[in-house]
């Protein structure tokens, strides 16, 4: 089982998603699955990121709600980097 680390950006974005009325139980389901070291269901469209985010992964909680995360197996840590819409995450 992985230890979960929350970045400051993630904590701030989590509050924003709560304020926007997002179904946070969907996010908790994804986090719990990742924490257990299991693969996400195909509906979450989990994929590796490129460019500046190389090494990080992203999944789609809902069509315009994403989670960026990093799994560090050497220290068994799941780092939740950020969550939000595509525009939120890319600062568009």
Locations of regions flagged by a protein language model:
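Short, functional N-terminal and low-complexity linear motifs
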Residues: 1, 14-17, 34-37
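Enriched for short, Lys/Arg-rich terminal
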Residues: 3, 9, 15, 19-24, ...
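Residues that recognize and position ribonucleotide moieties
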Residues: 3-4, 42
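A short, surface-exposed loop/turn module that caps and links secondary-structure elements
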Residues: 33-60
């Amino acid at each position: 089982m992985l230890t979960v680390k929350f970045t400051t950006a993630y904590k701030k974005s989590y509050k924003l998603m709560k304020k926007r009325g997002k179904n946070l139980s969907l996010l908790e389901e994804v986090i719990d699955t990742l924490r257990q070291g299991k693969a996400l269901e195909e509906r979450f469209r989990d994929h590796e990121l490129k460019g500046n985010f190389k090494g990080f992964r992203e999944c789609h909680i809902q069509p315009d709600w994403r989670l960026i995360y990093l799994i560090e197996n050497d220290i068994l840590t799941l780092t939740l980097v950020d969550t939000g819409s595509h525009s939120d995450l890319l600062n568009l």
